[in-house]
Design a protein with these regions (language model features):
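Histidine-/acidic-rich catalytic cores in large beta-rich domains
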Residues: 5-433
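Cytosolic-side transmembrane helix boundary signature
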Residues: 1-2
């Protein structure tokens, strides 16, 4: 009888624990101080699996020179400079390098150790630097992704300023009037019924003074959507919670408009919301959402302003259904066979509300795919440049020809240099020295 009693108690405990796990993973807060430990314990296996996968990836990176990753092509007939941050295992530090892709040379570099400027317990390999900008005085501005700090560093490597106060991440884009636009994030709370609510990771945007890092403007993307009667984009779609928590929007780029036209105004912003496969055309001057842009692109990174009526979108083309490693899948057993095999570029014409994909026929032959991160840029006189972060692959397409396909460089140990939110320059005429 005792065994039966213990068994029944065990079943009751399992039922109560299962209900508690379901409650906290759906955003419930009724368990008070127990909410966070129950959630962390429930997600332990997922977190441990992700950590193990990263360790395996790091180990495999150590063994891979990159020489056989893909057929290398370099038919550039003009200079192209790429400013790229990468963790150099041979140097045991993060290095931001300016490469001349045509010549295959490293022309400038900055070795960066964030612990020289801030207190952090994050080991160097995990700090992650992103999206550097080269300025006219040969200083650089860049994001410390996992420390959520923006730095400006002189040509000689001295810290000029650091910006804190927001959790900065992903993209950093300049405005003509000496300002920078950047993605931010914070935890937000939505009250639901009287006794409980939902906490989630909210995306935001911030504008910084490039001369000193002062925050000039800050706004929550959720609040932008709520105020424009678009709450469904925040709360309406039910996807599985990620290990990091509820992240309904996942802003990964903010792109500023530089000219007035019939379809946009100077100072307008295009916001890329990865987890909604949506681009938001937002006007900070009056707080209005001008357009919600959706189409045949999935979990995109990077939206670019092309001209007075065109924008371009880097489409990762990764399914948002299923586990995080669910990509490059064909549903051969279904009547509708939708292929997720190639990342590409979508150009959207605001004038006639149409999309077209200018690079599909070429990219399908290259085998270009990155299931996360990645970016692109149209470079007049050169062509389209595309970065696959997962494969450290730089593809450049001019008309219907691939004029570059390969990695940027090899380090001193023969490993390919990773690409990590690079920036492209067709010339360096803007430098004062």
């Amino acid at each position: 009888m005792k065994k039966i009693a213990w068994f029944i108690l065990f079943l009751v405990f399992l039922m109560m624990y299962s209900h508690a796990v379901k409650h906290v993973l759906e955003g419930g807060q009724r368990l008070g101080v127990l909410t966070k430990p129950i959630k962390e314990f429930a997600l332990f296996v997922t977190t441990a699996t992700e950590a193990y996968s990263q360790i395996k990836k790091d180990h495999s990176d150590d063994q891979e020179s990159g020489l056989t990753a893909y057929t290398k092509i370099n038919a550039l007939d003009k200079d192209l400079f790429v400013l790229n941050p990468t963790y150099r295992k041979d140097l045991n530090t993060w290095r931001i390098s300016l490469y001349n892709v045509k010549e295959g040379t490293e022309d400038l570099f900055w070795d960066v150790d964030e612990s020289d400027w801030i207190d952090t317990e994050i080991v160097p390999r995990r700090r992650v630097l992103r999206h550097p900008i080269l300025l006219s005085d040969s200083s650089i501005v860049f994001i410390g992704e996992n420390t959520h700090v923006i730095y400006r560093v002189s040509k000689s490597g001295e810290l000029m300023w650091k910006a804190r106060g927001c959790r900065f991440h992903h993209a950093l884009n300049p405005e003509e009037e000496g300002a920078l636009w950047v993605c931010t994030k914070k935890e937000s709370f939505v009250k639901q019924y009287e006794k409980w609510g939902i906490t989630y990771e909210d995306s935001g945007i911030a504008k910084l003074d490039i001369s000193n890092g002062e925050i000039l403007y800050e706004e929550s993307v959720s609040q932008i959507l709520f105020k424009n009667n678009l709450s469904g984009l925040v709360l309406g779609a039910r996807n599985g919670e990620q290990a990091s928590g509820h992240d309904p929007l996942h802003l990964n780029d903010v792109q500023v408009v530089v000219n007035n036209s019939e379809w946009m105004e100077k100072g307008d912003l295009f916001l890329s919301l990865r987890n909604r496969s949506t681009i938001i055309h937002f006007r900070p001057s009056n707080g209005k959402v001008i357009n919600v842009i959706q189409g045949d692109f999935i979990q995109q990174h990077d939206v670019d302003y092309l001209n007075d009526s065109l924008i371009s979108i880097f489409n990762n083309n990764k399914s948002g259904i299923g586990p995080e490693n669910f990509f490059r899948k064909n549903f051969d057993d279904l009547e509708s066979n939708y292929s997720l095999m190639t990342s590409n570029v979508h150009v959207y014409d605001l004038k006639n509300n149409r999309f077209y994909q200018p690079l599909d026929s070429v990219l399908s032959t290259v085998g270009f795919f990155t299931h996360d991160q990645g970016l692109h840029e149209y470079l007049p006189g050169v062509g389209w440049a595309l970065e696959s972060q997962n494969h450290s692959q730089l593809v450049i397409i001019n008309e219907d020809s691939v004029i570059h396909n390969g990695f940027l460089a090899l380090d001193s140990d023969g490993r390919k240099v990773d690409m990590n939110w690079s920036r492209f320059y067709t010339n360096l005429d803007f430098l004062n020295n």
